[in-house]
Amino acid sequence: MSTTAVGLEEAVLDAAARLYVWALKDIPQDLRDALAAASERETSVTGIRVLETIRRNVEIADEQQNLVCQDTGIAVYYCRVGERFPLHPAGIYRALKAGTERATVEHPLRSNTVHTLTRENTGANVGYRVPIVHWDFVPGWDGLDVKCVPKGSGSENMSFLKMLVPADGVNGIKRFVLASIVEAGGKPCPPGIVGVGIGGSADYALHLAKEAIARPVGTRNPDPLVAQLEDELYGLLNETGIGPMGLGGEVTVLNCHVEHADTHMTLNPVAVNYQCWAARRASAHLGADGSTTFERDA
């Protein structure tokens, strides 16, 4: 391995360690604004108290430089890798895994990762195929963008997939998303962000739903038809009355984001992925020389 590659791998490792902790401690400003707006919009006495408690929790985390939630989740990374970035993806993955482990040990953070059958804890939030990394490759570019989205179990357990048929149409999509959120109730710690993935294949629809929750709160899909669906779903979901923490109220979700892909003419896969109120995310941009810039959304 070249000296440049060694230095880059260490830079990625350091970025991953910092991103994981940053995401867990400091929620994004757009999320803070969404929670504040929710507090103003909520009319239920219980709902208002829940939202006030959530916002006070965030203030205490800021004051004490501590975690906003005890569930440190599974570390999920989204990587945009330039074609000319000098470090091979295998080295990037190795660094992301080592960075996650370093953050867990040095902070220390609660370790959640276990073997799926024995349930034995791996000890440092890493394990077989963990952390989870999603890749996107950019032709002609020499940089690397890394986004860390820690995902807790309460919200991840409320994930849904349905293979609709084309005849179900847009109304079928709406019915399924609405039914999913009603079934979830208060389990995913609402109000949060609902991610919807439409199209592709079964696995890709789930991927798109997860990608949707990683966007800044309230951003809209560039496709006007999809953006319209986001607005309609957002309104419908807040008519359920589930409310903050499932205790009733006006605000069930902070927003709904939809990502889509073209699909087979006889398919209509739809997936739902819920993100809890904490909606943690943090990003970094690395240059070919290892220089690193930390941003909320790289």
Language-model features and meaning:
Residues M1-A298:
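Non-transmembrane, aqueous-exposed alpha-helical and coiled segments at domain scale
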